[in-house]
Amino acid sequence: MSLLKEFKAFASRGNVIDMAVGIIIGAAFGKIVSSFVADIIMPPIGIILGGVNFSDLSFVLLAAQGDAPAVVIAYGKFIQTVVDFTIIAFAIFMGLKAINSLKRKEEEAPKAPPAPTKDQELLSEIRDLLKAQQDK
């Protein structure tokens, strides 16, 4: 099998396509959550903490010299990233919890008994005939 045919068979499987869609949606969801945290969650928290803008919080390790930029530890951006992660992780947890509860409900649903085989039907007919003969 040629490499192109193998790749086509691999890419056309349902799992690969589902995974690609999930990655694209996940990336878009991550951007939405990042904007939500940076633009909606953190400003009120900053106001509560005395007008702090978290994206500007940093430690200067080495001041800017000439054309060289300052060396800083931007812990404010890190705090925002941790909040992003926490919200995304919680949303994924809640989604998986909902999916798992639906799966459990499907598993708990009583299954219909299997249809009797031809042998079982024949034995039932013989039993019924014998019972009918005894009752006469």
Curated annotation (Swiss-Prot):
Membrane topology: Multi-pass membrane protein
GO cellular component term of the entry, any: membrane
Subcellular location: Cell inner membrane
GO biological process: monoatomic ion transport
SUPFAM superfamilies reported for this sequence: Gated mechanosensitive channel (SSF81330)
GO MF annotation terms: mechanosensitive monoatomic ion channel activity
Matches recorded under InterPro entries: Mechanosensitive_channel_CS, MS_channel, MSC/AndL, MscL_channel
Keyword Cell inner membrane: yes
Spans traversing the lipid bilayer: 9-29, 32-52, 54-74, 79-99
Keywords annotated in UniProt: Cell inner membrane, Cell membrane, Ion channel, Ion transport, Membrane, Transmembrane, Transmembrane helix, Transport
Lineage: superkingdom: Bacteria
Role of this protein: Channel that opens in response to stretch forces in the membrane lipid bilayer. May participate in the regulation of osmotic pressure changes within the cell.
Family: Belongs to the MscL family.
Subunit relationships: Homopentamer.
Protein name: Large-conductance mechanosensitive channel
Organism of provenance: Vibrio cholerae serotype O1 (strain ATCC 39315 / El Tor Inaba N16961)
Gene for this chain: mscL
